[in-house]
Amino acid sequence: MSFTSKTDDEIIKLANPIWSNLIRSSNMKDYGGFTKDFSSQMLYGANEVELGKQWASNKLISSLSDNFQAFGCLRRGMHVTVLFKQTSTTEEGEFLGRLVLGDEGGSVKIFGATIF
């Protein structure tokens, strides 16, 4: 069964620990941990200096709470976007997390990740 053919529940079960690792690593400003599940395409664009600048200038991405909830999946081509409701330990309100997953070499990898 291809990755994109899995049910939403199956994909969310795979996505939750990946998202959790992104949160933990981002809060610790840990480049190696943050990029460990990146696809080769994402790694190519994930410059450690640029990520460091983002961590320094954006309070939200280093204060993410482990209180998150996946609420849906969108399929497009070879990728699935998992949407998360995310909160922060310092910023008020709820934020939208977006995690784009796909298969690379038989493993589920990150092809995109953002928070709004």
What are these language model-derived features?
Residues 40-58:
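A solvent-exposed, acidic/Ser-Thr-rich amphipathic alpha-helical stretch
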Residues 106:
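Catalytic subdomain that performs nucleotidyl-dependent activation
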Residues 1-28:
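Short, low-complexity N-terminal intrinsically disordered segments enriched in polar/charged residues
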Residues 52-103, 112-116:
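Surface-exposed, charged secondary-structure patches
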Residues 27-41:
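Short, well-ordered alpha-helical segments enriched in acidic and aromatic residues
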Residues 21-22, 33-34, 84:
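Residue-level detection of beta-strand scaffold positions
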